[in-house]
Amino acid sequence: MNDIRVEKLLINYKTLEQFKRFKEYGNQELSMLEDLQNNIIENDSESPFYGIHIGHTLIARMSLYRVRAKYDAYFEPPQDYLELWKLEVLPDYRGRNYGKALVDFAKSFQLPIKTNPRINSHGFWEKMGFQKAKYEMERDLGENPLIWMPAGVREKDV
């Protein structure tokens, strides 16, 4: 598994075509097609998309957004953190550590991470070292975020 390489995905029509394979398998909430289409339309060259290819086939992907410290409502001391969204591995490739490789890549930035897990995915996130954030109604708006914190970071009191 040492040969798994996570790479930033280009914002182009080839990536858009590859994302369509995920929409067939994933839930609407996981669809990154609209996000990618908006980035293409806006000519936004800073891609938040990362993925793993086997040959020329994209088999796992996620969105990773950096949130600036001034908007940090989760961690102490206040700092930049990452929001990890829409992690998905195609069904034929699940159970082979590709999801773990994506999460480990996000952790390699040594910034706290927040994610909103899908139903039935809590076990995966717990294995990855994530914990439930203390719920705060105004901040979390009905979501149940999970967080991961590197050494020296703690959860903000609500």
Model segments located where?
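Residue-level recognition of the GNAT/N-acetyltransferase active site
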Residues: W85, L90, R118
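Conserved GNAT acetyl-CoA-binding A-motif
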Residues: V103, S108-N120
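Short amphipathic alpha-helix that is part of the acyltransferase structural core
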Residues: M1-I41, H53
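Conserved acetyl-CoA-binding loop-helix of GNAT-fold acetyltransferases
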Residues: V89, R94-S108
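Active-site or metal-binding loop neighborhoods of secreted/extracellular toxin and effector enzymes
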Residues: N144-V158
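Conserved acyl-donor/pantetheine-binding loop and adjacent beta-alpha core of acyl/acetyltransferases
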Residues: N27-K86, R94, E138-W148
